[in-house]
Amino acid sequence: MKIILKTLSALLSASGESSAHIDADVKYDKYGFPYIQAKTFKGLLRESGLEVCEILGKDYKVVDDLFGKTGNKDSGILAFNNLCLKDFNAIEQELKGQGNILNIEFVKKFFTEIRQQTTIENGTAKDKSLRKYRLIKEGIEFETNIENVPPSQTEFLKFTLLNLRYIGTRRNRGFGKIEIKPVIDQLSTSSNPTAQSSINSTNNVNPLAKLSFEITTMDTLLIAKIFGEQNTVSTEKYIPAQNIRGLIAGMIIKNRNLVNVAHKDAVFKEIILAEKIKFNNAFIKGTQPVPKIYGYDKTDPDSKAEFIFEQQKPMKAMSGFAEFSNAEVKMEEVETTFSFHNSRSDNRLAGRSTKDEGAIFYYEGIAPAQTFESELIGSKSDLNYILPLLEQNGGIHRMGKSKSAQYSKVKFDRIKLAEIKPEILPESKSPVYIVFQSPVITYNEFGTAIPDVSRLQNELVTYIKKLTKISIASSSDTIENYMGVWQSKTPREMAFDIGTTLKIEFEGVLENKILTEMEMAGLGERKAEGYGRISLMNLTDGLVRKNSNNNSNVQVTVPLNPFTNPTLTSIFNNQTAQDELNRLKLKAIGNAAHHYNKLPNSLISKLKESLTNASLKSNWDSFISDIKGKKAHKTLDDANLWESVSQLEVPKDVLNYNSFPTQKLYWLAYFKALRAKQIKPEKNGK
C-alpha cells in the first residue's frame, strides 16, 4: 500500500541528534534531504490502530497481528520503509550522475527552518531554557510503501492511516500536523520466479560451481554485533554468511511450506543442514579483510604496511577492509549511520516515555547505497535451486535486525552461476599465508569454544605433512546468533576474528590440489553455518598504504543548471542565487574598506534606513533629491561617494548589476560594513 504524507504544519521529526547550534535536529540523508524514520512511523501508526479498535469496538489482536506485540520478538505482518520525499527515487538517480553540485547545508535549508523557544517563568525567560529546533517546513510531501498488507485488513489499515493526524516531537504544541492519503494497490498475480520443487541432477553429473552475487543496501542495514555500550546496538561492517544462509533458509521454508517440519525436508537438509554448500561473508565490493599480519610504524603515519613479525619498532596493527593491487593496499571505509529511537511506556495516556517507564536506544547501521559481494560454492544443482530464490521480488529481500521497519531492505543483483574449472597452478613453496575470511571456532576437550592454535595445527597437518612452524597474527571475537525457531539467541562463543593470519612454514613444496582442498574445507567448527572460511593469499611485505578517495563533502561549482527534476532545479536556482548574493555582499564589504571613518555614523544610519524603506528605485531617487545641496550631500561628495551612492552604482562584473534589488542588496551590505567598522572603542579599551 502506497501512502503520501503531507505536512500541514512545521514538523519536528527529531532524530535524537544535536549540534552546537541545534538542540533537536531532524533526520536527513547524506545529500541533506529530510526523511521520517520507518520505526517511528510504525510506532505512531500502531497507536493509531489501537484508537481505531476502541472506536470500532474491535479486539486489539488485529493490531498485534499487523504490527507485532509489544515486548515480543515477532514483528508482525506489515513491513515499513522510511518516508522519503515524494519522487525521491528520481531525485536520487539524477543526483548520482551530477556529483556534489548541491551544498548539503543549503538542501537542508530548502526543506527545513530553524525556530527558537524558551520557557517563561515569572514574566521572564527561565535560565538556560532557550532551545533551538530544526523543523521540516509546512507543505512538504513524503511517500512510502507499506508491504505485506493482508487484503482482509486493507480497510482497517486505511482507517488507521486516516486517524493519524499528528506526528513527531511537541505535537501537542502545534507541531506535526499531517494529512495522509492511502493509495490502495490493485491485487495482481505475482510474476516472481518460483524455485523448483526438488533438486535435480542430470545423469548423476553434478559439477562443482559457484553462485556469485552483489548485495546493495536499499535501507540502513543493521547486522547486530556484541558491543558493551548500554542502549546502543552496533553493526558489523560486513554481511555475515550466517545472515545469507538464514535468508535462504527462510525462503525455502516459506516456498515449501515447511513451518515446524523443515528438518524433515530433503531439500532443506541438502542446502541448509548438510555441509555441502560453502556460505561466504559479503564484504564491501572489491575488498577483503586486511590480514592482521600487516601493521605500520606508529611514529610515521605515512609509513608502508609491513609484516609485524620480528619488528623492533613500535607498530600499529591494521584492520578493516582493503583492495590489494600493484604493491598497494587501499583501505575502504564502510559508511555507517546512527539512528535514535525511544519506546513508549505502557501508559498510553502519558503520550511519551516517562522517567520510570519507556527507554531510549541507538541503532548503528550500514548506510544505504553501498554494495557488497559474495559467493556460494557447492554443487551446480544445489546452487541452481537457490538462484531463482534470490531473484524473487526483483532480488529485493530483508535481512538483519528490525526487519519490519526502517532497517534490512537489500537488493541481490548480478547473480551469476558458473562451473568451477580446475586451474593448473605451480606448486607452492614455504611459507604460505592463510587469512581467515570469517570467524574460526575451535573447541577444547571439554567442548568449550576457545581460540587455540594447537587445534588449528592438528587440522593443518592432515594437509601439510611436513609442517615445521606456525606463526599467527590474530585477535579474538565473540559470536552470537539469533534462532528464529527458538525466538532466542544462541550461547556466546569465542573465536579467532576475521583477518587472523597464519604464516605456515614447511619442508619441500605443496601441490596446488592440497591447498585447494584445504581452502574449500576451511578450518574449525560450525563450518556449515558459514564459519571457518579461509583464503590462501600471496602476501608481500612493504605495501604502500592508501585511503579510498572520498570527496563527498567537496562541492562542485557549475554555471548552468544541470537538473531536469523540478525539485532539484528549484534547489539549484535558489542555491545559485544565494551564492551570487554572498559574492555581492563580500564585494560590498571589500569596497567599503576604502571609506572607513569617512562618513559619520548618523549619516550611514540615515542612508541605510532610507534604502531599506525604498521599495522602488524612484523612492530612493526622491530621497536623494531631498538631501541634494544639504550637509549630507557635501559629506558624501567630500568622501567621493556622492555619485556612487546617488546612482546606487554596482560593479559591472556583478550579475544584474543594473537591477534595483541587486543595487539595494549591495549598498545595504556596504553601509552595514561601514557602520560595523566605525564602532569606536570604550575608554577601557573594550
Protein language model features and the residues they cover:
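Conserved active-site/ligand-binding neighborhood in enzyme cores
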Residues: M1-K686
